[in-house]
Amino acid sequence: MASLSGPISPTNLEMFKPGVEELNPSKLLLLSNHQEGMLYPTILGSLELLSFKKERSLNLQRDKVCLLHQESQLLKLRGTGTDTTDVLLKQPMATSVNCCHDGIFTILEQDRMPKTSMAPILTESSGSLVTRLMSIPRLTFSIGTQVAMRLFRLGFRLARYSLRVTILKAQEGLLLIPDLLHAHPVEPLVQDRVVEPILATEPLPLV
């Protein structure tokens, strides 16, 4: 071994690093720590550098295919002393099943949102619609009856003739309703009822 009393020459320095590879700026990779502002130099060999680049490109391609699941706020608070109940942890723990070994979250199948049943609303609206439709003929017949009685009392010849034609057409329609129901089925509300022809009990006044 050379003496260390004098100045150290470059040839003597080579004796102290027989297996150390010369530093190359292209092989010096700075990896950022989780804490901001902390950088650590890491020396990688040529094979390790290639494998790192290949693994990084595969991870980037996988990120494009698989959607990243956002980490829940409760998962961030785990291990920090924050009190979390089992009820609040059910949903985050259920999503942890989709986590791969490399830490990438993949969404396999999203739980379907519970749909509110619209049956009561539809039933209520249809019931109110049927009630209104059934009240319209009654109102129309009551108004028509009052108008017809006033016209007959006044003795207007043209008005009485028009009313007579209208009443005869209505009676004809009532007689044809059973045949029309068999040929053209309608809603069950009308089918359940037995439609009977309504005959005039009193003869209509002649014009």
UniProtKB/Swiss-Prot annotation:
Belongs to the coronavirus I protein family. Pfam families: Corona_I (PF03187). It is found in: Virion. Keywords: Virion. The keyword Magnesium does not apply. It comes from the Viruses. This is Protein I. The gene encoding this protein is included within the N gene (alternative ORF). The lineage of its organism: Viruses, Riboviria, Orthornavirae, Pisuviricota, Pisoniviricetes. Coiled coil: none annotated. InterPro entries: Corona_nucI, N2-like_embe-CoV. Structural protein that is not essential for the viral replication either in tissue culture or in its natural host. GO terms for cellular component: virion component. The gene is N. CDD domains: embe-CoV_Protein-I_like.
